[in-house]
Structures are given as C-alpha cells and as structure tokens.
Amino acid sequence: MIKTPSLVSLLHPACLSGKLRVRSACLDDWANIEMLYQHARRRTPRLWWWEEYLHHPLFLVVEQRDTLVGALFAWADESPVAWVRLAVLADSLPLDRWFDAVLPVLIDRGQRFQGSQTLAWMDYDDWAADALHQRGFLRWEEVITLEVTLPHKDVESTSDVMFRPATHADLDALVAIDHAAFLPHWWQSSQTMARRLAASAYFSVACEKGTQQVVAYIEGGRQGDTRAHINRIAVHPDWQGFGIGARLMRSALITFHQSGVRTVSLNTQRSNRRAQRLYHQLGFRPTGDTTTVWTLDL
C-alpha cells in the first residue's frame, strides 16, 4: 500500500532521496494525488477532469520510498495531439529527475495507446520551460488573456444568420465546426463538447436562416458573481468574414451584462491577429497574462 504523504514528506529534501518508480495510476491514488496537488508549487491548473482517467495507461504516478511524489497525465481528445492535462511533483523533487523518469514512459504509451503524433504542454507560470526545452520541446504558440468591462462597444455586422441556444442535437455540427476552424491542437471531442454543453452558463449557436445549418458557436461560463469567461468561439471557415463572430460575441456580452456580470475575459493565440482585431473593437484589452505552449513531435 502506498503511504499517504504528509506535508513534511512532500517538502523535506531528506525524504526525497532514492530511486523513482513510475507506474500506472489507479483509483486508490486519488487521495494522495489530491494532497500532493494541494501543497505542491509546481503543478498545472485544474482545467480537465483528470480524476475520471485514473484507470488509463496514460495516467502515471511517480513513487519514492513508497510515497507518491508526482503525477503526469496526457490525453488526446480525438486528436493527434495529446495535451498534458495534469503535471504535479513534490517541491523538493528535482524537476530533471522527475522528467527523466516519467516523460519517456508517457511518450511511449501515448504513441501505443492513442497514436499520438505530438505532445503539447501549456506552461503556466513557466516552471517547466527550461526542462521542456532541454528535452526537445519547441515554443509553438503564446496564449494571451484579454478582458472587457461591460457594457461593451458595439460592432456593425451584416450576417444573415439567427441565434439560438445549443442543444445535444447540435453536437456533431459543433465538432465539425471545431475541426474545420482550428488546428488539431485545439480540437474537442463530442464527449468534451457534451460536457461543456451541460455545464456552461452560456452556449449559443449561429444558424443559416434558410437551411438552419449550424455555422458557428460560442460558449462561456461564470466566474463568481460579476465575472465571466468566454471559453470558446468558432466560425466555420466557409462562413468567416460575414460578421458572425462579432454578432455571437455581442449577444454573449449582452446576456452576461444583463445577468450581473461586469467583466468578461477570454484567451486567444498571440498569432491570431484577426481575432484580436475583433476583440479590440469590442473593447477587450490585454491583461498582460501570457502562457507558453510547448510541443514535442513524437
């Protein structure tokens, strides 16, 4: 049985000497991973439902002297790109030792079990940057955060579409739009889309008036009483350039404002100048928060 780590064991260097052992996670590891996550400084944000994948071969834990001192989980969401969904290690465990122990196992299993072609890492706080670079990862993109204080600026548009709330029947169309509008790095599966549809405070689609074809969507959620975040906006390439994105954004901002939201944020790639121009027109401004995306071709 794996020992439950105390806060002392997670922080004291003397407790972190010895050989590292990498194995597949199991359901019984949840409490130990959770305790480690609560106390560790080097960790990725909680943006994925990693607890549900503890049985999967791509969820790895690292042990030292029968104590769980690290975890690494990657998942390709019906995409050739596997994203690191959880990375956490004890504060006194050298980063290079952890990487050298667990990364080769993760890469091997990603290729064997999911056919992954690329491993991607969103490096919040830059704690892994040097180690990633030393292991062949390349800086692929920067994600920047923008926000607007409501009410927003209006934007003219002439698109011949109508809007309605998204439903479960739209899932296939939503996934198709995702795959057409984004690079594989950003694809979402129908399962992920269904989760967002069930959980999001705001999920709207744009439909062509004649055929009722779904051509775009926007999805966002509340962050407390007065803040909201736009998680995703996508317009099918065949329908880009007609102001649909502007109308989707405007409708979402109005709805959030009417529900008491005062500030709305979103993320976008630094290279996506077209999207940034639209957001700027709507009153969004950069917050200064930047996250580097690292990728490794497998």
Regions found by a protein language model. Name each.
Residues 1-13, 78-80, 90-159, 292-294:
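Acyl-donor-binding surface of acyltransferase catalytic domains
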Residues 14-33, 162-174:
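A short beta-loop-alpha structural element at the N-terminal edge
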Residues 118-122, 230, 264-268:
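Conserved hydrophobic beta-strand within the GNAT/NAT acetyltransferase core sheet
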Residues 144-162, 167, 262, 267-273, ...:
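C-terminal "cap" of GNAT-fold acetyltransferases
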